[in-house]
UniProtKB/Swiss-Prot annotation:
Interacts (via C-terminus) with the large tegument protein/LTP (via N-terminus). Interacts with host DST. Interacts with host RIGI; this interaction inhibits RIGI activation. Interacts with host CGAS; this interaction inhibits host CGAS activation. Interacts with host TAOK3. Residues 1-27, 1047-1123 are annotated as: Disordered. It comes from Human herpesvirus 1 (strain 17) (HHV-1). Keywords: Host cytoplasm, Host Golgi apparatus, Host nucleus, Host-virus interaction, Hydrolase, Inhibition of host innate immune response by virus, Inhibition of host RIG-I by virus, Inhibition of host RLR pathway by virus, Viral immunoevasion, Virion, Virion tegument. The gene is UL37. This is Inner tegument protein. Its EC number is 3.5.1.-, 3.5.1.44. InterPro entries: Herpes_UL37, HSV_ITP.
Length: 1123
């Protein structure tokens, strides 16, 4: 039927791709109504014909309203305010002129129908989001004001319709006000927006279930506005804010749980700070109540969990362990690292911390100790029987709860209570990926891979990581459907190897996510909106058409069906007229010749020209479906996925959808399918984003369903007329499908390349760092190290030149930190390899899909084949990079640490046997110690017999390695003199050596000599004499003793002795009899020369009261030994 006015290419008017077009649905409706405002007077020749001007005006009016209802283009608030008054005026005038139920329904419900099309995009900033919502509120108030009610009253129309001004104003304004209140309350509790406001009350907040804050905004009272864009955007913004509060409040319950051990509470606090209270711009911001609580908790921790600094310096440390150790040592959750050379205790991370007889961790939250768990998972160590039973009990209980619940809040609380926070899940996945990437299962017994503990950790971490990822956006809004589909589709590809190892591949993980985090379907909301529209149509039909069905009822319901299908993946459940029921039964209303004559009048883009009685005849329906739907299929399938061709195809699809509207029933939902096809193709006409593979599949499915309808109509007409059916929509014959699939496949390839590019850069950076650290450590341990007893020197060559010196603890800490940098680079390499592996898996699956599509095209050099070759080339490059980079993870040992590891292993065995021999009561441990010594010596002799490989680095390279590793370690300053480093111990330092002293005077009592006159006259003479008081005598004696124990520093100023005061004696010091004669005490002139000298009996510094000749020069101990 291409000769009936359907051009292969028609001129089109392009629209702006940015934002709603200036010629939007509201402007087009306004232009159509303005043209129909004054209908022409019917003439005698066309009084009763199909070309009656009144009939044509009515048909055009209904077509304009149908186009507005079915349009998927959004309307800007400014356009709505500008067009509202004239649009309502034209509608009321046309209703007065025609009295149609459609004009009444559209005028009465236009505020609600307009609100459902207002475009809104809320920014992430709360202030801007509130301003945008205020713009929507002002627009709604403008279109539902008193002017609107007055205009409707003047035209004899209702203002209290379901989507009328009264209901919409009340419902929309109430919803926006409530949304603002709820959102502001959530922002007040959100740790991201109000960290400083988190006080004692906030730290005691009750848990907030996921999605609860938006529950009052999705009640049936707001069903009529639920699909509106401002409602959907508001729910999305509120979900992003409230979900953070939900996760924060669930985590907050554990930091002060009295049933947990102090270490467990402290670890939960650190995880809380790292997860919610740390930002790249400001670092960790800890509220004072939380800081005080953490300090109190740390003081209760058993010190046995910490390893002493000197012993900890010998161990390789991870960044996460350093974070925990530093925070516990400094009693501050802000501390994340220690300065180089700092001696600091280290928290234990060995598997023994999980033993049941060690009360460090609570059994209900063992997974919160992330450094210990990561070490357990990555190294594959076998815990003790008690520790394994304890871990399995927690893991099995947690996994069972996850598998047997459908509540997101229950799953989130279960994960966090067990210690599986979002960051911990990521770390555990990285550890398990590192275990698999390093080939660790090859070292396990034959037939074994991951252990039972590792498998359960992997299952919970995989589910938890995806649950937390979805929980950040979980909500009752349409965009969450796309988010869930994306995460669900990638869940088993991101960690494909691990999913297979733990038994979650093959759709198990995706089904678990669908059961827990699947989007809620607004079936009841859409059903309520449908019932409200049906009720409005019935009301208008009773008032203005004597109860006859309105010709736009089906159109309004198609709008709802298309929205549910394209936004929520809801298949319309409204029963359509089956194609078999349209066959004429009995005597047809019109002869076949009438049908044929009317069929010849079907031309694009005309919607009129056929009498309504013929359109309403069921016998004419197959002609319309065969011709109109067939032409729409031909135009669509032959259009390339480019703006101009697709825009022409959209015009043909809209014509097919609106043809016979009001007279011709919908058959097999053909209008719904055409509307959904228009919605899916509209982005291409606006030059928007490219198609996706899912979109291409949906369009192909819709085309196939329309083809079935059209071909069925052709088969019904075959006895009467021979019509050429449209070609089936195959990839090999449809330009639209092959171009869509090619663009979609290219888009997937581009997304994969964009994901792979930073991963490869990370791989490159990690490999470069690994190479540098490997060479540096190898050269570092090729050096010789010498000691003078308390300092270490590095000898890089045969010359006697040495580098250093450094304190042993500083060198140990520097080596430990440099090895941590090596392990950080190795972990980054493992994470990048795991992510790149997921890209390879997705690319392989995508290549298989493209192979199937390319096989449907007969000619070889088609666009799909080109894209397939590009995908294959990309897969080859990425797979090669992955294979080569994976070889770097084949070893366990830090390069350069091989011999050091052997030495430490032998030393630990000898130390353990030696300790056992010392504590042994029998000869067996001693014999074992001797045997261990023999074996160690024999091994050393065997190694020495092997020819030692020459050094691979030069002296300059070794010196550079020393400087690189020890860059931040402070060098030990050389001593001032050889004597300064020497301490001579004599009997004077031994407080228990009393053999050289006579203890007799200490036991004698005081006796008054006979020469003392105790008479009154004698005492009077005695008291009038000058006396040396006891306090002065003791002060001088103490000064002499102390000064002899110190050696004065070289220089004009000598060290000042410490003054000892008797703080327990409250009696005042005795005053001398002659306070004006300081010379009587032997050092009066020295004190008299001092300005403002105190009284002779007033306590002063000891060194100033000691005569110079009584201060003996110290000979044995420097002053610095006491400091």
């Amino acid at each position: 039927m291409a000769d009936r006015g359907l051009p292969s290419e028609a001129p089109v008017v392009t629209t702006s791709p940015a934002g709603p077009p200036s010629d939007g649905p509201m402007q087009r409706l306004l232009a159509s109504l303005a043209g129909l405002r004054q209908p022409p007077t019917p003439t005698a020749e066309t009084a009763n014909g199909a070309d009656d001007p009144a009939f044509l005006a009515t048909a055009k009016l209904r077509a304009a309203m149908a186009a507005f209802l079915l349009s998927g283009t959004a309307i800007a608030p400014a356009d709505a305010r500008d067009c509202w008054r004239p649009l309502l005026e034209h509608l009321c005038a046309l209703h007065r002129a025609h009295g149609l139920p459609e004009t009444a329904l559209l005028a009465e419900n236009l505020p609600g129908l307009l609100v459902h099309r207002l475009v809104v995009a809320l920014p992430e900033a709360p202030d801007q989001a509130f301003r945008e919502m205020e713009v929507i509120k002002d627009t709604i108030l403008a279109v539902t004001g008193s002017d609107t009610s007055h205009a409707l009253d003047s035209a004899g129309l209702r203002t209290a319709a379901a989507l009328g001004p009264v209901r919409v104003r009340q419902c929309a304004v109430e919803w926006i006000d409530r949304w603002q209140t709820v959102t502001k309350s959530c922002l007040a509790m959100s740790p991201r927006t109000s960290i400083e406001a988190l006080g004692e009350t906030s730290l005691k907040m009750a848990p907030v279930p996921l999605g609860q804050p938006s529950a009052n905004l999705t009640t049936p009272a707001y069903s009529l506005l639920f699909p509106a864009p401002f409602v959907q955007e508001g729910l999305r913004f509120l979900a992003l804010v409230s979900n953070r509060v939900t996760l924060f409040s669930a985590h907050l319950q554990r930091i002060d749980d009295a049933t947990l051990t102090p270490l467990t509470r402290a670890l939960f606090t650190l995880a809380l700070v790292d997860e919610y209270l740390t930002t790249p711009e400001r670092g960790a911001v800890v509220p004072p109540p939380l800081l005080a609580q953490f300090q109190h908790t740390v003081r209760e921790i058993d010190p046995a969990i910490m390893i002493p600094p000197l012993e900890a310096n010998k161990m390789v440390r991870s960044r996460e362990e350093v974070r925990v150790s530093t925070a516990l040592s400094r009693v501050s959750p802000r501390s994340a690292c220690a300065p180089p050379g700092t001696l600091m205790a280290r928290v234990r991370t060995d598997v023994a911390v999980f033993d049941p007889d060690v009360p460090f961790l609570s059994s209900s939250a063992l997974a919160v100790f992330q450094p210990a768990v990561s070490s357990l998972l990555q190294l594959g160590e076998q815990p003790s029987a008690g520790a394994q039973q304890r871990l399995l009990a927690l893991l099995q209980q947690t996994w069972t709860l996850i598998q047997n619940t459908n509540s997101p809040s229950v799953v989130i609380n279960t994960l966090i209570d067990a210690g599986f926070t979002p960051s911990h899940c990521t770390h555990y996945l990285s550890a398990l990926e590192g275990f698999l990437a390093a080939g660790v299962p090859a070292r396990t017994p034959t037939g074994h891979g991951l252990g039972e503990v590792q498998q359960l950790f992997g299952c919970i971490a995989l589910a938890g990581s995806n649950v937390f990822g979805l929980a950040r956006e979980y909500g009752y809004y349409a965009n969450y459907v796309k988010t869930f589909r994306r995460v669900q589709g990638a869940s088993e590809h991101t960690h494909g190897r691990l999913c297979e190892a733990v038994g979650l591949s093959g759709g198990v993980l995706s089904q678990t996510l669908a059961r827990i985090m699947g989007p809620a379907v607004p079936t009841e909301h859409l059903a309520s909106l449908r019932r409200a529209l049906v009720g409005e149509f019935e009301t208008a039909e009773r008032r203005f058409s004597s109860g006859q069905p309105s010709l736009l009822r089906e159109t309004a319901l198609i709008w709802i069906d298309v929205y549910g299908q394209t936004h929520w993946d809801i298949t319309p459940t409204t029963p359509a007229t089956p194609l078999s029921a349209l066959l004429p039964v009995g005597q047809p209303s019109h002869a076949p010749s009438v049908h044929l004559a009317a069929a010849t009048q079907i031309r694009f883009p005309a919607l009129e020209g056929i009498h309504p009685n013929v359109l309403a005849d069921p016998g004419f329906v197959p002609y319309v479906l065969a011709l109109v739907v067939g032409d729409a299929l031909r135009a669509t399938c032959s259009a390339a996925y480019l703006p101009r061709p697709v825009e022409f195809a959209l015009r043909v699809l809209a014509w097919a959808r609106d043809f016979g509207l009001g007279y011709l029933p919908t058959v097999e939902g053909h209008r719904t399918k055409l509307g959904a096809l228009i919605t899916l193709l509209e982005p291409a006409a606006r030059g928007g984003l490219g198609p996706t593979m899912q979109m291409a599949d949906n369009i192909e499915q819709l085309l196939r369903e329309l083809y079935v309808i059209s071909r069925g109509a052709v088969e019904q007409l075959r006895p009467l007329v021979q019509l050429q059916p449209p070609p089936p929509p195959e990839v090999g014959t449809s330009l639209l499908l092959i171009s869509m699939y090619a663009l979609a496949a290219r888009g997937v390839l581009q997304d994969l390349a964009e994901r792979a590019d930073p991963l490869i850069r990370q791989l490159e950076d990690a490999i470069v760092l690994l190479r540098l650290h490997m060479r540096t450590l190898s050269a570092f341990f090729e050096c010789r190290f010498e000691s003078d007893g308390r300092r270490l020197y590095a000898v890089v060559g045969d010359t006697p030149d040495r580098l250093g010196p450094w304190p042993p603890e500083a060198m140990g800490d520097a080596v430990s930190q440099y090895c941590s940098m090596y392990h950080d680079a190795k972990r980054a390499l493992v994470a990048s390899l795991a992510s790149l592996r997921s890209v390879i898996t997705e690319t392989t699956a995508h290549l298989g899909v493209c192979d199937e599509l390319a096989a449907q095209v007969s000619h070889e050099d088609n666009v799909l084949a080109v894209v397939r070759r590009e995908i294959h080339g990309f897969l080859s490059v990425v797979s090669g990079i992955h294979a080569r980079a994976s070889k770097l993870l084949s070893g366990d040992q830090v390069p350069g640490f091989c011999f050091m590891g052997q030495f430490l292993a032998r030393w630990r065995r000898l130390s353990a046997c030696y300790q056992a021999a010392r504590a042994a009561a029998g000869p067996e441990p001693v014999a074992e110690f001797v045997q261990e010594l023999h074996d160690t010596w024999k091994g050393l002799q065997t190694e020495r017999a092997v020819v030692v490989a020459p050094l691979v680095s030069s002296a300059d390279q070794r010196a550079a390695a020393i400087r690189e590793v020890m860059a931040h370690a402070p060098e030990d300053a050389p001593p001032q003199s050889p004597a300064a480093d020497r301490v001579v111990l004599t009997s004077r330092r031994d407080l228990g050596a009393w053999g050289d002293y006579s203890l007799g005077p200490l036991g004698q009592t005081t006796a008054v000599p006979d020469s003392v006159d105790l008479s009154r006259q004698g005492l009077a003479v005695t008291l009038s004499m000058d006396w040396l008081l006891m306090n002065e005598l003791l002060r001088v004696t103490d000064g002499v003793f102390r000064a002899s124990a110190f050696r004065p520093l070289a220089g004009p100023e000598s060290p000042r002795d410490l003054e000892v005061r008797d703080a327990g004696n409250s009696l005042p010091a005795p005053m001398p009899m002659d306070a004006q004669k300081p010379e009587a005490y032997g050092h009066g002139p020295r004190q008299a020369d001092r300005e403002g000298a105190p009284h002779s009996n007033t306590p002063v510094e000891d060194d100033e009261m000691i005569p110079e000749d009584t201060v003996a020069p110290p000979t044995d101990l420097p002053l610095t030994s006491y400091q």
